[in-house]
């Protein structure tokens, strides 16, 4: 066994690649390797809150990473520095030590207890995927087989897969449900060939009732693994066993994926998950806060939801970062504290939201007219022309609809907005002075 500090630094390097930046910096960066007690690797966490979070969320990820680096499955125990006594070092859930040369027993389903249908927040971007997943869970291999869920990182694909597994086991405790990533499938397949255990490997994954395989896109370019998965897929499908697959893209967009696999992925139902809208993001934060027993002011949840619009993982990570920051500096949570806690993870280059009123204000300054003139009925050129420029910019620089733009200009009809946009666009093609004016206005707005 290598020096544990070096081992842990290597592990952190691998884990950093698998987590979002906010999650890694909030939970992993401050951990340190303490010691190795028998088969248990002792890791220090900065406080009780962090320790509990690491145990509930990242135990398996860390154990898998250590296994990949050492070939040994060690128990992982988190402790707080000031409480390090002999009793603290006793592992809560020891993991059987196993060398890579020894055959594994039937794999555990590895389902996260927090990923259930009850904890999944339904929104416009995931409603269909949720309904399809529930249908599959209620009637495995009878509704959609395979079910293929795709979408960006951290949008809830893995959550739905775990939820399917939990539902099946809850309603049929004897069911053999296995969840794993395609990367793990690949690694185990390679090890089985090296150790001459291919038959054991095949029996392990072809004798299940439900196979949940995550991030299938990592099979791209791995010809032998694709061959093995092809036969695994066929065996399960022919025996009416449920297959659920996730990916960051639809089958047709996975490069170097064999056509025969691609076609099989398309046999069942393909559904996507898109980033959550503002209302869904707020609902996710509320549910997360309730699940963790956190009292978070509405203004803070609104602030986080407005700032983090990429995915659920970063959204929840931001919430926990705010809570952890509040705990560390011993201050109440409010919007100002949230802004301070998240300043390092919210891009400073986040595009400014430009409003129609912003445009009217800057155009008014440029042409020396009052804000009320934009809504007035005046038709003099000194007012009408700047108004048309403002309408043009509102169409170009905001997401507002034509009726909405018209409403902000004194309730004018949408055809008036179209006319203004067309007129200014035509003038810009050969009017250098106007081009310069528009450029200056845009620079001030940005």
Swiss-Prot record:
Domain III, AAA+ region as annotated region, ranges: 110-326
Could you list the residue ranges forming a coiled coil in this record? none
**Notes concerning its domains:** Domain I is involved in oligomerization and binding regulators, domain II is flexibile and of varying length in different bacteria, domain III forms the AAA+ region, while domain IV binds dsDNA.
The beginning of the lineage is: Bacteria, Bacillati, Bacillota, Bacilli, Bacillales
Return the PANTHER family for the record.
Answer: CHROMOSOMAL REPLICATION INITIATOR PROTEIN DNAA
Q: Where does ATP bind?
A: 154, 156-158
Q: What is its main location?
A: cytoplasm
Where found in the cell? Cytoplasm
**Stored Pfam families:** Bac_DnaA (PF00308), Bac_DnaA_C (PF08299), DnaA_N (PF11638)
**What does this chain do?**
Plays an essential role in the initiation and regulation of chromosomal replication. ATP-DnaA binds to the origin of replication (oriC) to initiate formation of the DNA replication initiation complex once per cell cycle. Binds the DnaA box (a 9 base pair repeat at the origin) and separates the double-stranded (ds)DNA. Forms a right-handed helical filament on oriC DNA; dsDNA binds to the exterior of the filament while single-stranded (ss)DNA is stabiized in the filament's interior.
The record, for InterPro entries, names: AAA+_ATPase, Chromosome_initiator_DnaA, Chromosome_initiator_DnaA-like, Chromosome_initiator_DnaA_CS, DnaA_C, DnaA_dom, DnaA_N_dom, DnaA_N_sf
* Family as reported in the entry's similarity comment: Belongs to the DnaA family.
- Region (Domain II) spans which residues? 72-109
Can you name this protein? Chromosomal replication initiator protein DnaA
* GO biological processes: DNA replication initiation; regulation of DNA replication
Q: Name one GO molecular function term.
A: ATP binding
UniProt keywords (A-Z) are: ATP-binding, Cytoplasm, DNA replication, DNA-binding, Lipid-binding, Nucleotide-binding
Q: Where is this region: Domain IV, binds dsDNA?
A: 327-446
Q: Which CDD domains match?
A: AAA, Bac_DnaA_C
Q: Where in this protein does the record put region Domain I, interacts with DnaA modulators?
A: 1-72
Tell me where on the tree of life, at the top rank, the source sits: Bacteria
Q: How does it assemble?
A: Oligomerizes as a right-handed, spiral filament on DNA at oriC.
Q: Which GO terms describe its cellular component?
A: cytoplasm; plasma membrane
Gene encoding it? dnaA
